[in-house]
A protein has these predicted regions:
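An N-terminal, globular interaction/scaffold subdomain
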Residues: 1-133
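C-terminal structured domains
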Residues: 5, 9-32, 36, 40, ...
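Conserved aromatic-histidine-acidic binding/catalytic patches
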Residues: 49, 111, 179, 212-216, ...
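A short acidic (Asp/Glu
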Residues: 54-55, 116-117, 142-144, 218-222
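A generic structural motif
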Residues: 68-78, 132-136, 157-160, 235-251
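Acidic, Ser/Thr-rich peripheral helices and adjacent loops at domain boundaries
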Residues: 83-94, 151-160, 252-275
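Conserved, well-structured core segments that form the ligand-binding/active-site neighborhood
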Residues: 102-106, 110-201
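ATP/pyrophosphate-binding catalytic subdomain of soluble kinases
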Residues: 184-252
Length: 358
């Protein structure tokens, strides 16, 4: 572990890393140059309490996306102008050839945190992308400085409020990726499927009801509304307090043609104390060629990994669809690899923040 003034510590880390990579691999019968995996730079930013979890995450990610990992946090117990650094390297066999990758842990003093962007630029591998993930406890000063210099910004709107995410998003041109957006793909896909062969019904929506689990963490309804609103050209106009136990109107939007849309949010069973809140159901009230049409995509009470997909009125349908489950390593990998929804997510985040700010 090295600690001290920024320039001295970073110079020492760079020197030690260069020496490690330039020295031959002595684990083989005949010494040979080390083979370094350089698929990306992954920069994870969080609080001191999150460091161990971030380490575990980095190790799991390296199984498929080996490269250089930087774990960055802030510690007000350090000399304000200092930085503490530690690094390690791991080699694993891929056939006959050991593949090696490294990890650098950086803890900044309060004043030194302003230099985080230049430090990261100095320590990252220059010819591959810089992926920055802001963990829920990421200090604002670090996130604000790193967002403009990254090639991709990852966050989790199930843990971080949408207003903060939108604030950071406005400060970067980098593509955005959201763990929660990946987890809720199945719900969005099923909602969008209602309108595959009747797009005119999407323009006639006059009421939206969203059921979600109660809890202290960020409301997942905001991003779902942001996604729908940004796709359909809605303008959010008002938002009031939720109506306990019912589906009372808590907000209003204006459709692209100026027609009013009622928004109702329903509290479902509470999530656990530390659990993320989840979408439990979406109901849309619209019309098709002048006839009322009610659309529903709702989790089954006794099988919450399955949704019931229904149409009533102008059309009729009733199907069951699995929502699926993926572990968090898969979710993170998807945020890194899937590029097709970048613009869609940015627009959804900004619209969700506009709703939440009312």
């Amino acid at each position: 572990v090295s600690a001290g003034r920024i320039a001295e510590v970073i110079k020492r880390v760079e020197s030690e890393l260069a020496e490690f990579w330039s020295s031959p691999d002595e684990s083989r019968p005949e010494p040979a140059p080390k083979t370094r995996a350089s698929t990306m730079n992954f920069v994870a930013v969080g609080s001191r309490a999150e460091v161990e979890r971030l380490k575990e995450q980095a190790e799991e990610l390296a199984e498929t996306h080996a490269g250089r990992t930087l774990l960055i946090t802030l510690d007000d117990r350090l000399d304000p102008l200092s930085v503490q650094a530690d690094w390690s390297a791991t080699c694993r066999r891929a056939g006959e050839v050991p593949i090696c990758y490294d990890r650098v842990e950086l803890t900044f003093g309060v004043a030194a945190a302003e230099r985080v962007a230049s430090v990261v630029s100095a320590l990252t591998i220059s010819d591959v992308a810089v992926i920055v993930e802001l963990a829920p406890g990421a200090p604002n000063v670090l996130g604000d400085a790193l967002a403009p210099i990254c090639d991709r910004l990852v966050f989790d709107s199930a843990e971080t409020c949408i207003e903060r995410i939108a604030e950071v998003a406005r400060g970067t041109k980098a593509p955005l990726a959201d763990r929660a957006f990946v987890r809720t793909f199945s719900f969005r896909e099923l909602v969008a499927r209602f309108f595959d062969d009747m797009p005119e019904a999407s323009r006639a929506i006059r009421r939206v009801e969203i059921a979600r689990s109660a809890g202290a963490k960020p409301d997942p309804a905001a991003l779902l509304l942001g996604w729908m609103g940004s796709r359909l050209g809605w303008t959010f106009e008002s938002r009031g307090p939720a109506q306990p136990g019912g589906a009372g109107v808590v907000g209003r939007a204006r459709a692209a043609d100026g027609a009013p849309i009622e928004i109702a949010l329903v509290d479902g069973p509470p999530a656990g104390e530390q659990a993320q809140r989840r979408i439990d159901g979406v109901r849309l009230f619209t019309s098709l060629r002048g006839e009322p049409l009610a659309l529903g995509c709702v989790r089954l009470d006794k099988a919450p990994a399955t949704a019931r997909w229904t149409m009533e009125g102008a059309r009729s349908a009733d199907h069951l669809h699995p929502l699926g489950y993926r572990d968090e390593t898969w979710v993170l990998t998807k945020t890194i690899d899937s590029l097709e929804g970048d613009r869609l997510l940015r627009e959804a985040v900004l619209a969700a923040a506009a709703w939440s700010a009312l």
